[in-house]
A protein has these predicted regions:
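Positively charged n-region of N-terminal signal peptides that target proteins for export
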Residues: 1-9
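C-terminal motif of bacterial Sec signal peptides marking the signal peptidase cleavage site
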Residues: 16-19
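Bacterial signal peptide processing site
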Residues: 21-23
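Short, hydrophobic/aromatic-rich segments at coil-to-beta transitions
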Residues: 35-41, 67-75, 133-142
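Secretory pathway targeting signatures of secreted, lumenal, and periplasmic proteins
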Residues: 48-103
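Surface-exposed amphipathic alpha-helical segments
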Residues: 57, 166-193
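Long, charged/polar, surface-exposed segments that mediate recognition or autoinhibition
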Residues: 93-123, 186
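Signature of long, low-cysteine stretches enriched in small and polar/charged residues
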Residues: 113-156
Length: 193
């Protein structure tokens, strides 16, 4: 009886950990909204969005363990790794993606507005531009960092149905990177279910 109970706990824990390592416990759909088959090479964001690897970056982590599986994130990195403090490392360039599942489209839109309201802090906005890719509108916010390990970056905040998405690319000046083009290419690699 004890062995069965321990085995059940280990099995449950391994399933949870496996789910977290593959983008959460929400499985990807078989097809996208347009009927295109799901590609297993995409990073699964909450079973609603498949994301291609940004060119020149390597996947570092993907998780769906925050806030009862409503928040998922992924990080891709490029360049030299630097230790900031014990157990904290940064790279010359990092791409972050965070998604949050909301109860409704109205709630998601309110969350988008909240994200815009929080934008700033140690960042200096240098440009703001709206682009449309595959029928999806994105607002790109370019910035310089004043108190960060990075020197500059670009952020996109948008909504897809009841999901909020925040993408950010930040880099040190040592990395020659066209942030705007990198972000546009990254956003073009999103596939919606």
């Amino acid at each position: 009886m004890k062995k069965t109970g321990i085995f059940a706990v280990i099995l449950a824990l391994s399933l949870v950990l496996t789910g977290c390592m593959t983008g959460g416990m929400i499985p990807p759909p078989e097809t996208l909204a347009d009927g295109t088959p799901w590609n297993t090479e995409w990073v699964n964001m909450a079973g609603k969005v498949g994301v291609e690897r940004p060119e020149g970056f390597d996947l570092l982590t993907t998780n769906g363990t925050l806030e009862d599986m409503t928040i998922h994130y992924a990080t891709w990195v490029r360049g030299e790794e630097t230790e900031v403090d014990k157990d904290t490392y940064i790279y010359e360039g990092q791409v972050y993606l965070m998604t949050e599942l909301c109860d409704s489209e109205a709630s998601a839109q309110a969350t988008v507005e909240q994200w815009y309201g929080q934008f700033g802090g140690n960042l200096t906005l240098t440009d703001r531009e709206t682009v449309t890719l595959a029928g999806q509108e994105f607002e790109l916010l370019s910035y310089d960092c004043t108190d960060s390990h990075f020197d500059r970056g670009i952020t996109a905040i948008w909504r897809y149905g009841s999901m909020v998405l925040v993408a950010d690319i930040a880099c040190a000046d040592t990395l020659e990177l066209d942030l705007r083009q990198t972000m546009v290419d990254f956003l073009a690699g999103f596939h919606y279910a």
